[in-house]
Amino acid sequence: MNDGPLSNLVKHSTLFCLTVMLAGCFSDGPGDLFYDYQTKIARVQDADEIKEELEFESLPRKRELLLDVPSLSIGLIDSYQLRQCGLFNLIAERNSVLGKVADEFRNYDYQVALLAGVGRCLSGSELDPEVVELLREIEQQKLAQFPRHQWNLIYASDAMQSQMRGSQWLHADIGDQVRQTSDALEHINRALNVPLVSGKTTEVQEVLEKSSTLGDLYYSLTRASAELDTITKQLTTFDDNIICGKQRDTTKFRYINNVFEQQYIGKVQPYMAQLDGYYQQLAPQLGMFDAQPDLHSYYFPIKDAHHAFRSSTRRHVDYWQQLFKRCGRKVGR
């Protein structure tokens, strides 16, 4: 049997506090796809629409995610020796008024530059022993603190908070936006994994701050899963209303088959495939959001949302396959 679009589709805690009626009204196109789909199914079933509530938990605010990093007092010791290896000006800039109010992106770039500078100084042979000892101590302390600076860059920076705090459906015409976000996240990943040879994180800060691609994708995946689960429940709850078989009135089956073709195959499935495509494009960069329980209990659960999205799709497709088998329709016919 040729499973056609059904098999092809299968092959292929949330960002803001809000309670929505899953079968209710929506403010934009993608949400209407699911609403229309369920409405037409319920009409054919001659049944009430099942309504489910879904509560989205907000992305924690910056103050809830910011990890404290004890400051190290680095005095301008032996300024001549530090100048020789390029560390003096860096420390002086950090100790300035502007340096003390740097955001998480600039702070991360400073921490990377400081470690690189300390390494250069230690590789020289003209430092006094007491300076070498102090720099080695600073290096050890900074390396121990580095994971906390990385965490703060990902979760407590204004740019990444903006990027992850989504509240609307993604549309199917934002390919350029997704590519820009993917490129920016790739840059951040390099800065996290090979910081001493990567470019500054501030190079992509504006791109990340001016969109909420990740947040809106997370919202869309989560919302689509919930909508589809509600529609699957609608179908299974009133499955007995769809009569088929020899010498039976199969009018409702013909009608619901039309709903499947026109609404699901024609509209919902293409949108779901687009969401999945956006996720796959960003997926190589999402490792930075894996859980880090040693640092914090929170993690950005976009991978979980995509797993639930795939599972919801599989359950929905399973229902239609079972219905078509019961009623003798060959998929793709």
Tell where the protein language model's regions lie, with residue ranges.
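Bacterial N-terminal signal peptides that target proteins for export
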Residues: N2-T14
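Eukaryotic low-complexity, intrinsically disordered regulatory segments enriched in serine, proline
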Residues: F26-P30, E55-L66, E206-T213, Y264, ...
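N-terminal Sec/ER secretory leader and immediately downstream segment
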Residues: D28-H171
